[in-house]
Amino acid sequence: MLRPGAQLLRGLLLRSCPLQGSPGRPRSVCGREGEEKPPLSAETQWKDRAETVIIGGGCVGVSLAYHLAKAGMKDVVLLEKSELTAGSTWHAAGLTTYFHPGINLKKIHYDSIKLYEKLEEETGQVVGFHQPGSIRLATTPVRVDEFKYQMTRTGWHATEQYLIEPEKIQEMFPLLNMNKVLAGLYNPGDGHIDPYSLTMALAAGARKCGALLKYPAPVTSLKARSDGTWDVETPQGSMRANRIVNAAGFWAREVGKMIGLEHPLIPVQHQYVVTSTISEVKALKRELPVLRDLEGSYYLRQERDGLLFGPYESQEKMKVQDSWVTNGVPPGFGKELFESDLDRIMEHIKAAMEMVPVLKKADIINVVNGPITYSPDILPMVGPHQGVRNYWVAIGFGYGIIHAGGVGKYLSDWILHGEPPFDLIELDPNRYGKWTTTQYTEAKARESYGFNNIVGYPKEERFAGRPTQRVSGLYQRLESKCSMGFHAGWEQPHWFYKPGQDTQYRPSFRRTNWFEPVGSEYKQVMQRVAVTDLSPFGKFNIKGQDSIRLLDHLFANVIPKVGFTNISHMLTPKGRVYAELTVSHQSPGEFLLITGSGSELHDLRWIEEEAVKGGYDVEIKNITDELGVLGVAGPQARKVLQKLTSEDLSDDVFKFLQTKSLKVSNIPVTAIRISYTGELGWELYHRREDSVALYDAIMNAGQEEGIDNFGTYAMNALRLEKAFRAWGLEMNCDTNPLEAGLEYFVKLNKPADFIGKQALKQIKAKGLKRRLVCLTLATDDVDPEGNESIWYNGKVVGNTTSGSYSYSIQKSLAFAYVPVQLSEVGQQVEVELLGKNYPAVIIQEPLVLTEPTRNRLQKKGGKDKT
């Protein structure tokens, strides 16, 4: 077994030998060649006013200071309570990788690495950046599927990534035991960097461009002023800031509490081990690539002539620093470590010795056990915080070194230009809310840490901490009948099962046990009538004398007449799609706005911010948790609901997109004639406590019509056939509404100068480079999920955005962005799925006409086109 060395050098972190920089004067990083700056001292200078105050001197905070100052922002101040890198940065293993299983974070990783590659030349500071590449190991067939899945999601990105055979792996990592290795995922350019040196280089660059980095300068108080500025108090004095950015690492919770916020963060212990010199490693002619054994759940890299490896224990064995959760971080904690606990990671040590046998010859010369901070879903929180003006966060970084460079650039661009440079909704701090309790956060953080290296399936569900307090009124009635999905704290039915059907959660890269039940739900909606729980929708009430002016400023569509609803989009100043909502004009000057569950606070923050900036006299209320929503859809929907209300629901009286207040089974509801299925349907908004009674009444009334339930998976198949776009997939901050095919909802000729109007006019005048198209393809047992590569003539030319099996034509269906010249109906392309390219053809959309369109055609004597 691995022999413990003569001593465990706690607190001593062995660094790799730094690479030597080139002599000579570094080029300017300020964008102002030849302009000399006087030397700045972090200890002696002070400012009374600042444009931006960054709280926290770890790698992320210093990166933001660097990027803001480099971009030309004056009066950038960073306040650090002890010294730069104190906290989690100084003891990090320093891994860098282009890989990320998600889509948007690949851009963050890319920007980080590209910055780190040039930072030494720019600043004259050595950063110790090694780029030997990295290999992820597949030792099971399902891992090979996962790698194929990730390959197709990388083809349309700038990142280099290759699926390599065992022979190539052996050549690149000759010390590996190849008995179980089936394949590898190889990223050239991956590696590791010295976190301390990296931070000091960023600090040098920030100072050179005029930023003030002040330490030790602990923030003791934060006070918001009525004009949106902040008073920042420290022992050295106070400072007025136009905005503050919380980048305080594991101190972020304490900073948040100063202004009444409870950030969902949990400090966890993470260990890695450094070995003595290993002769076989020392004899190598080149540095080993970083190794990630996913089944063993550890990373391993070369550290001088030895090895460094760090495991991720299971959620049962991992260690949360509970005392910090309860009592806060000890005031003096900065560059300390925890006691090592090798017993906790022994199974991973054994796995590493089996995979890399030379480890058996080594001594342990160092065990590093330090704190890192986890959010519930392991992703950081980056951006402005809803409900608190000019308060931004960059917190919760479990992988701060690889995120720091890219996040600093991303956040700097957002602060300077008023909108995010690209879509990164998964990092939005407003994805959490009051439902995110400490108990939930700890349960999810444990799960996320323990699941670091599990297989990443599409449609993945994780079950720790569920359900939250946010369950709909129907949860107990439906939970035994369906597979629930988690949406912003809510439980929502994904698919329903019948007696005798497989009810287990069985994730797969191929069609799995929900495929047939979802097909039945699809037919139920298309042929009869079905009910779905839509309670997770975000719901806002807006009223006041300026409500119409505010909404006309926010939305690209016109404001609907009283008693009607429309689909409207909020755009960014550059004309990108920030959000999609339904807007119902309930009474003169009073509106009900509906958005998706995942964008509730994301959208609310934008609306509130614009209302304050413009000085609009409005009242905005978030009523998401007050209202339940039932969707009733299908050709028999009118017949069923008519039994329960005295209101005339006929087509001529209750028109498409009309909204009315009425009673259903004597229960007050706001009924909107709309359905994301594209079929005849209503959304029924009601008091949350009435959900069970309303549901029971509808189900009882629909017995003769064969009423049943349906979930979100069937909804997705239905909306794709109707060519309905989904926010976050077909449209987001990476797309404009013209290329997304949303022209109908954009009124460039309306009098109001809505946000993004002028930019959109310019986009239209210049012409589009790509378009969203709908395509069909015949596959084996796999369907598009979104973000797969589109091929044409041997090259990747675009990407899917979402997909499903079409139960009407029994083929796969997908939306995709392709170049304009390849966007014509009938154009043939290929879609890559699990390592195979399938022929696909662009079709005239929609595949299936919506119920209102079919009605209009029938009235004109046309045919019911499908």
UniProtKB/Swiss-Prot annotation:
Residue numbers carrying N6-acetyllysine: 114, 148, 168, 223, 335, 360, 434, 523, 655, 764
What are the protein's UniProt keywords? Acetylation, Disease variant, FAD, Flavoprotein, Mitochondrion, Oxidoreductase, Transit peptide
* Keyword Transit peptide found: yes
Name used for this protein in its record:
Dimethylglycine dehydrogenase, mitochondrial
Q: Where is this region: Disordered?
A: 20-42
This protein's assembly is summarised as: Monomer.
Give the encoding gene's name: DMGDH
Q: In which pathway does it act?
A: Amine and polyamine degradation; betaine degradation; sarcosine from betaine: step 2/2
Question: Can you quote the record's cofactor note?
Answer: Binds 1 FAD covalently per monomer.
